[in-house]
Curated annotation (Swiss-Prot):
Gene3D superfamilies: 3.30.420.40. It comes from Pelagibacter ubique (strain HTCC1062). This is Type III pantothenate kinase. The lineage of its organism: Bacteria, Pseudomonadati, Pseudomonadota, Alphaproteobacteria, Candidatus Pelagibacterales. Pathway: Cofactor biosynthesis; coenzyme A biosynthesis; CoA from (R)-pantothenate: step 1/5. It comes from the Bacteria.
Amino acid sequence: MIIVGDIGNTETKICLVNSKNIIIKRVILLTKKINHSSLNKSLLGLNLKNKSINKCLFCSVVPKKFNAVKIFFKKVYKIKCHELKKLNLNKLIKIKVNYKQIGSDRLANAISIINNKDNFIILDFGTATTFDVLIKNTYHGGVIAPGVKLSLDTLTDKASQIPKINLKKTNRVIGLNTISAVRAGFFWGYEGLIDNIVNLIKKETKMSFKIIITGGFSGLFKNSIKTKVTLNKDITIKGLIRATTLIK
């Protein structure tokens, strides 16, 4: 069995994967709360002490928290954890930019779906909204825009008369009150941002792409984006599973 994990700015996912590369158990915890105690409590259900773990691989955009995870697994379970960007990724994917400046999760996403025939744009609704461009088997860079939830939380925190709201689809553009106006602004604003950036990428590269979407708000925008898209919620984890072949 193997362990793979995605340490994001907001959430951390840790998955137990069997020999057929199927996720059999997963835990999710808040990244900011990661410490020895929270990891010990969260991972009890995985029953790791009674399992043979061959490999452990994480992608992390929060180095301090990965270090805490690494120390925990080594101390409690005698398991050595690797970080994705420390592996020789050139065996799986060609990277045209300075990979040290690419989020580890974005590289995992790319590794998950890359092949020698298709071009992809991966749209990830995380703390930031990111677009990653893959042409054949090469990562060509991407776009980073403000995240939906981060932007919404910032607005409601800074504007005293705008209440906390749950973002959901709306058919109206013109809001009839504060809440519906904010919902319209975010829903149609991000829908326009997404379509525009995808079209600009196509124009700049003069190529066609398959669009993969993932992350927290992917379900909300799946049917409103004008371009045909495929939803892949576990793309990051699947990329990590694929990358474990690099661990000897």
